[in-house]
Amino acid sequence: MGHELTKNDIKKMEEEIEYRIHEVRKAALDDVKETRAQGDLSENFEYHAAKRFKNKNESRIRYLQRTIKNATVIDDSSADDEVGVNNTVEVLYEDDESTETIKIVTTIRADSLSGMISIESPLGKALLGHKKGDRVLVQVNPQVEYYVVIKSISNTDDSDAVSYTHLRAHETELHL
């Protein structure tokens, strides 16, 4: 089974595929041709770096295509009063009385250091469908579990997400 993705996640991945096929691929091939013409390939670092970059780009295209092909499309809308995808949630950790504001996102957008928690993570799974004030059991594994209380829920969207094209654009600039 593949990732659970929203329609917008897939749209952004398709944008990156198009960008990589029509922009990056052409530039990478030109770079390989140009560095190949510099002579002895056995000692031509630029040629080998250009080939590696071209192969990395092709690998990324295949990865994105495979991810989309195997994805399960999920709805990113939820009721105003319950936790769903793209909601910002403030939780209270009962064990130490600390609070944290997190955003529930699809796995492909998850970044726990930035407070973007995957719907497939123990915390994300536990919170989905719950309401403000609910005390929720989070099971990390059979030996580790803890409780959180939902303090607030904000219905947001994924407009804070950076386009996949822009996330990868710096790769191209570094190698061309």
Segments (PLM) and residue ranges:
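Internal alpha/beta loop-helix hairpins
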Residues: H48-S77, D81
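N-terminal cationic and glycine-rich segments that engage phosphates or anionic surfaces
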Residues: G2-S59
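Non-DNA-binding regulatory cores of transcription-related proteins
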Residues: D75-V148, S154
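Conserved, well-folded catalytic cores of nucleic-acid-processing
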Residues: R20, D31, Q38, L64-A71, ...
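Conserved small/polar residues in nucleotide/adenosyl-binding loops
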Residues: T165-T172
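Acidic, proline/serine/threonine- and glycine-rich low-complexity intrinsically disordered segments
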Residues: A161-S163
